[in-house]
């Protein structure tokens, strides 16, 4: 902890120093970190997740022994949060960074620097200057408003008129362990212009470099991606308002979260794009919320019209590459097959729902997929044309094996032992409509019928992905010992057959803001950590 205080000061020097106007402009960048007292139980909780509970407990107890009721931890107050602010100016290298360390006792803090860190702070009026090894510029700090307020290079940054008052800064409480906010609408226009100009030059240099073995289609794709970046990045920087990142670990809910949010300036094209991501309908969900989902993915994403239109010649080149690289005997079929799926790819829209669900008995699983098609009946024609000619050694294809609500269902039975081992069946059921493909791996076809009869998802988010940690490994590692899995499940959950609280979820939502949230339950991380440790023994 003694090193932590000076580490924060040294960390600030990496950002350079800033200049502010007399009226104290609001910070461009704000960072708030919870108090030591709040961080200690979080540290112990996270250590336990990674199967290091004893080490975490000892670390917390050690830090508590360093805490004094009057002087805190070497002068640092463990009951109040830490902070940093940056007010960006046109001259970026001269922009001040202000670091705020909660102060318990001035003398104890100076003793930390002089006696324990072997530094020599020198005082001029109320400002201290200290040379820190491996830091090219001097560090300045003063005691004010109950905090150690520090900066680098320019002592004038510490004048009260040059930075947001500490009380005002911490009126906004940290929303998690750490809370970072970047106000894009406060970035000086000149800085944005310079950043964009440098980015464009760098991008042009990279795109101009030849790539060994690159096909015509691959080159067109690379150039297309570069062109889209030169459109998207300026929009984000010029029309963006706030970008925030919040990290949290909550022992009560047993959850680790990373929450990223991005908002746009009102009335901009970017704000309209974000708003359009909300309140859309999508294909029916193929899994129930209360099902034993191993993996569930739902997506509704699409390229903007201009990007989609510019992608068409790129797609043509990629498909041509694919055909040319195939064996001569396969090209005829490939051309027909690619022509059938090309309209769907050209639409550049991903509207899908997929799931891998375990049966209640744990002995079988169901795979389900539903995705949007464009001119899907062309694919249906291919199935009817080539399906009956599937070699018997590979399996059996049955056209019109079943039907529900006017939807024809075909059945494909593959001679695949691995498929049967994992899912308890080798039967694949599929239905192809002009606007939709539905597919399941299941014994009797009951699930595909339910999906085809289901109503559309009225609130389709751009992306949601949910996984269950204790059920995933057997599907991704065929050599994993089933007995080892049971042992680890029992160690983490008590009863391996009733493992709960081990989900991992990623969600992307739109509306007033674009929000990317990653939530992992602690038991999920612990299960994977213990499994990794046990597998290496």
Identify the residue ranges that each predicted region occupies:
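Bacterial N-terminal signal peptides
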Residues: 5-16
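In a subset of proteins, long, contiguous C-terminal domains/tails are tracked
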Residues: 9-11, 468-537
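Structural boundary/hinge residues at secondary-structure and domain interfaces
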Residues: 21-135, 170-242, 257-362, 386-398
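One face of beta-strands
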Residues: 27-31, 82-84, 97-101, 139, ...
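Short Gly/Thr-rich strand-loop-strand
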Residues: 73-80, 93, 103-144, 181, ...
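Long compositionally biased, domain-poor regions of proteins
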Residues: 79-86, 336-362, 373-384, 388-399, ...
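A conserved glycine-rich beta-strand in the N-terminal activation segment of trypsin-fold
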Residues: 131-209, 422-500
């Amino acid at each position: 902890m003694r090193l932590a205080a000076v580490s924060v000061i040294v960390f600030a020097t990496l950002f350079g120093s800033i200049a502010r106007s007399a009226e104290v402009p609001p910070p461009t960048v704000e960072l708030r970190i919870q108090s030591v007292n709040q961080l200690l139980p979080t540290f112990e909780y996270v250590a336990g997740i990674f199967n290091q509970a004893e080490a975490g407990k000892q670390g917390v107890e050690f830090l508590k022994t360093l805490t004094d009721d009057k002087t805190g931890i070497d002068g640092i107050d463990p009951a109040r949060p830490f902070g940093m602010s940056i007010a960006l100016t046109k001259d970026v290298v001269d922009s001040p960074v202000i670091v705020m360390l909660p102060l318990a006792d001035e003398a104890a803090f100076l003793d930390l620097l002089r006696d324990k860190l072997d530094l020599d702070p020198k005082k001029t009026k109320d400002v201290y200057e200290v040379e820190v090894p491996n830091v090219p510029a001097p560090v300045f700090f003063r005691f004010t408003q109950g905090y150690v307020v520090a900066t680098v290079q320019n002592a004038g940054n510490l004048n009260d008129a040059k930075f947001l008052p500490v009380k005002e800064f911490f009126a906004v409480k940290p929303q998690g362990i750490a809370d970072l906010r970047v106000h894009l609408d406060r970035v000086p226009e000149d800085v944005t212009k310079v950043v964009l100009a440098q980015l464009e030059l760098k991008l042009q240099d990279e795109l101009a470099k030849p790539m060994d073995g690159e096909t015509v289609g691959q080159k067109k794709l690379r150039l297309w991606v570069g062109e889209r970046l030169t459109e998207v990045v300026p929009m984000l920087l010029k029309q963006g308002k706030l970008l925030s990142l919040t990290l949290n670990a909550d022992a009560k809910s047993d959850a680790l979260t990373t929450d990223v949010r991005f908002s746009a300036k009102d009335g901009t094209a970017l704000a309209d794009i974000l708003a359009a991501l909300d309140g859309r309908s999508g294909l029916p969900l193929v899994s129930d919320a209360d099902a034993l989902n191993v993996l569930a993915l739902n997506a509704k994403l699409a390229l903007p019209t201009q990007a989609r239109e510019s992608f068409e010649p790129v797609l043509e080149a990629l498909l041509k590459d694919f055909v040319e690289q195939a064996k001569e005997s396969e090209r005829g079929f490939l051309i027909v097959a690619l022509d059938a799926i090309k309209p769907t790819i050209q639409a550049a829209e991903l509207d899908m729902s997929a799931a891998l669900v375990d049966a209640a008995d744990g002995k079988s699983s169901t795979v389900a997929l539903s995705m949007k098609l464009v001119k899907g009946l062309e694919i249906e024609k291919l199935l009817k044309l080539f399906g009956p000619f599937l070699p018997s050694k590979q399996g059996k294809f049955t056209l019109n094996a079943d039907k529900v609500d006017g939807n024809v269902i075909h059945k494909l039975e593959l001679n695949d032992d691995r498929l049967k081992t994992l899912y308890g069946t080798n039967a694949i059921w599929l239905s192809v409509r002009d606007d939709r493909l539905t597919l399941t791996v299941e014994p009797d076809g009951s699930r595909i019928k339910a999906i085809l009869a289901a109503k559309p998802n009225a609130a389709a988010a751009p992306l949601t992905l949910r996984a269950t940690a204790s059920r995933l490994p057997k599907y991704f590692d065929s050599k994993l010992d089933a007995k080892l899995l049971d042992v680890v499940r029992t160690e983490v959950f008590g009863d391996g057959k009733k493992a709960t609280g081990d989900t991992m979820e990623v969600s992307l939502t739109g509306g007033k803001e674009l929000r990317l949230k990653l939530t992992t339950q602690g038991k999920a991380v612990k299960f994977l950590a213990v499994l990794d440790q046990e597998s290496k023994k």
